[in-house]
Amino acid sequence: MTQDGYMQQEEEEWEREGLLDPAWEKQQRKTFTAWCNSHLRKAGTQIDNIEEDFRNGLKLMLLLEVISGETLGKPDRGKMRFHKIANVNKALDFIESKGVKLVSIGAEEIVDGNSKMTLGLIWTIILRFAIQDISVEEMTAKEGLLLWCQRKTAPYKNVNVQNFHLSWKDGLAFCALIHRHRPDLIDYGKLRKDNPMDNFNLAFDVAEKHLNIPRMLDAEDVVYTAKPDERAIMTYVSWYYHAFHGAQQAETAANRICKVLKVNQDNERLMEEYERLASDLLEWIRRTTPWLENRTTDNTLPGTQKKLEEFRSYRRQHKPPRVEQKANLETNFNTLQTKLRLSKRPAYMPSEGKMVSDITGAWKGLESAEKGFEEWLLSEMMRLERLDHLAQKFKHKADIHEEWTQGKEEMLVSHDFRQCKLNEIKALKKKHEAFESDLAAHQDRVEQIAAIAQELNALGYHDIASINARCQRICDQWDRLGTLTTRRRQALDEAEQILEKVDLFHLEFAKRAAPFNNWLDETREDLVDMFIVHSIEEIQQLIDAHESFKNTLGEADKEYKTIVGLAQEVQPMATQYQIPGGLENPYTTLTPEVITTKWRDVKQLVPQRDHTLQTELIRQQCNENLRRQFAEKANVVGPWIERQMDAVTAIGMGMQGTLEDQLQRLHEYDQAVVQYRPHVDDLEKIHQEVQEAMIFENRYTQYTMETLRVGWEQLLTSIHRNINEVENQILTRDSKGITQEQLNEFRTSFNHFDKKRTGRLAPEEFKSCLVSLGYNIRNDDRPEFRRILAIVDPNKTGYVHFDAFLDFMTREYTDTDTAEQMIDSFRILAGDKPYITADELRRELPPDQAEYCIRRMTPYNGQCAVPGALDYRSFSTALYGESDL
């Protein structure tokens, strides 16, 4: 039977039965009056007499407007009969417009106060607006309401609902309905079937006080009537149905709102955490980069060594936590973007200068400055070490030269030859010739001193002023010596015409002794000369050169004996011929004793030089062992890192097993990396020894500690990034309900077009991938493709990553929540009003969620707005990015 047919049958039964039972009419009048007042109070009015108060049609129209939520038009305000009939007809027309056929009910009977017709009209309204919308398993409203009551009361003792009259006489059915939905309000176990009055009054009082259901029946009328009025009972029971059904809807709506708000609050917390971490990391980079870009030192070796120690401390202590912070920041950003996409929220755009790309760029700048800083420090150490060596060499040669020049100027300006005899003059001349030879031999040393000073100038030696001053003094003195030598030679040439005799032995001694003495001086310089080598080959070259030098000592010993023999030849001759001053050699200041002393010094320095070279050879061998030790370790760690990186990349690009299998394998790789960390630490210790030994090259391996550090950091970052991507894919799969087969299909298509295995697709590759999956995109439909690109690449990077691609494809296969669903949920809480109040939010939502909504909602300014009304529509659309919050 249709709903309209049921309503027509109900009206006909009401006319027949109502005429026969005045008690039912009394019950209906009370129940219908209470039902009408429960709605009219929403408009600030009520009725006292159901026949009289509806006669002018005004409150009847108002009642229909309240229960339907629609406007019936402007009523006639006149008091004439035709005004009242017109108003009642408007109400009747509205009822008929809802598909209700009114039988035997006319406006005139209502205006005349006909009790039967008025009650019949109200019953028709109750059927249409309170009972007709009750639907249970395609039954009529009455049958559906009865079935609902039977299901709700089935578990209760002494309750057997079969109709809407006798089944309710003991009041237990009403108590059972309340207890079923609100067990906290009634202790059903204490109720008795033989105490109906208490049962009714308890149910009516609890319903009115706690469930906002008005008292429409009197216990006496039901208990003491043989057969209670069915329509009165149905009217009252329908309130229970709507009250409990609405509570269930409100709970569902509240849960939906809480879920959405919690997601939104969690996302906001993630955004705030990202902003804080990004600001902290960028500030650290901003502070650290200028320090790394500072290429100044105090130009001393200890100061530069201190700066190198500071840099090593930065590498070991300060940078690793920041590397981890950067990885966490990227992971949090990707997780946040995934959550936003899954909840259909707009993509998160960090504040200006805090994008992941900005942080990556700043980090690259930091690492570039770091690499340049380390290279500069090492080169500066080598430069300063070279400077220190050159300064010591300059001092040593300058000391020898200044020692040699002592007294030379006084000798050259002396006029001693004026009192000499001929042989003495000739001796002075020969002596001067020997001095010139000695002077020429010292020319190389002076040039070496000047060259060293020039190199110190070019390399920026810190105490270059004293070097230049000393070099200038030596050069000036050397020029004066040259001038004075020329003058004295001219003077001796003039005196030579007078003085002829020459002591050949002295002359021969002087000729031989001078170069031999220079050779001794140079040899002593070479034997005590400092050296810097960086390899076994270099020290071996010095050892070979020293061995070659030792092979020449035999010839030198012969020359020494010859020179000493010449001096020894003079003594018997001077004694024999009593030559005045014959033991003094007029041609040279050198004596056999000096030559002997220097020769003895040279022979003592040779084994010392042997020991020094052998000590350096041992040190270089130790350095070579360090190189080999580092290379052996690096040649194991480097390939291991590369294999792990290849394996992690293969997992990220592959499709073997489920996502959970991939995630487990990634965690296993992560654990393996953690366990492998001691090998890297051991390598760091060896590298520390290498640096302390000042070893700068290693021909046994292609790996440097810097490349291994970078590879290690990239491996950690790759593992964590892949774990994050797989977790996001699992989250996407589970939240969207896609199958593993669908996920594999998406990954297969994505990998097919990702030729370079970069984990991203260019726009044209992405378009081809969509077409391969059956997504229809015409070549001439560029706006549609641009719309899709805006979804998968909101930051306009020019590439589509797999997680964005997966999110887009899941939209095509799964249902999603929308702003409209949120609006419908708030409308249920608001009782179908276009606005909601703070009290309603606090009543239906948890305190923190309710206060969150109250702070964010804007005032509602539409029609029928009450003070404090809030606009939930704009709030809901703003949550989904469809308007500004």
Curated annotation (Swiss-Prot):
Please name the GO terms of the biological process aspect recorded for this protein, alphabetically: actin filament bundle assembly
InterPro entries for the chain:
Actinin_actin-bd_CS, CH_dom, CH_dom_sf, EF-hand-dom_pair, EF-hand_Ca_insen, EF_hand_dom, Spectrin/alpha-actinin, Spectrin_repeat
What Pfam families does the record tag this protein with? CH (PF00307), EF-hand_7 (PF13499), EFhand_Ca_insen (PF08726), Spectrin (PF00435)
Metal-binding recorded as keyword: yes
Which stretches are Spectrin repeats? 270-377, 389-494, 508-614, 626-727
Q: List the disulfide bonds.
A: none
Instruction: Write down the superkingdom of origin.
Output: Eukaryota
Query: What are the protein's GO molecular function terms?
Result: actin filament binding; calcium ion binding; IgE binding
Segments forming domain Calponin-homology (CH): 26-130, 139-245
Q: Which UniProt keywords apply?
A: Actin-binding, Allergen, Calcium, Metal-binding, Repeat
Region entry Actin-binding, spans = 1-242
Residues the entry annotates as binding Ca(2+) 1: D754, T758, R760, E765
Q: Which Gene3D superfamilies match?
A: 1.20.58.60, Calponin-like domain (1.10.418.10), EF-hand (1.10.238.10)
The reply to whether RNA-binding figures as a keyword in the UniProt entry is no
SMART domains registered for this protein in UniProt:
CH (SM00033), EFh (SM00054), efhand_Ca_insen (SM01184), SPEC (SM00150)
Q: Enumerate the residues binding Ca(2+) 2.
A: D793, N795, T797, Y799
Positions of the EF-hand domain:
741-776, 780-815
User: What PROSITE patterns has UniProt attached to this entry?
Assistant: ACTININ_1, ACTININ_2, CH, EF_HAND_2
User: Assembly state and interactors?
Assistant: Homodimer; antiparallel.
Family stated for the protein in its record: Belongs to the alpha-actinin family.
According to its UniProt entry, the function of this protein is described as: F-actin cross-linking protein which is thought to anchor actin to a variety of intracellular structures. This is a bundling protein.
Name assigned to this protein = Alpha-actinin
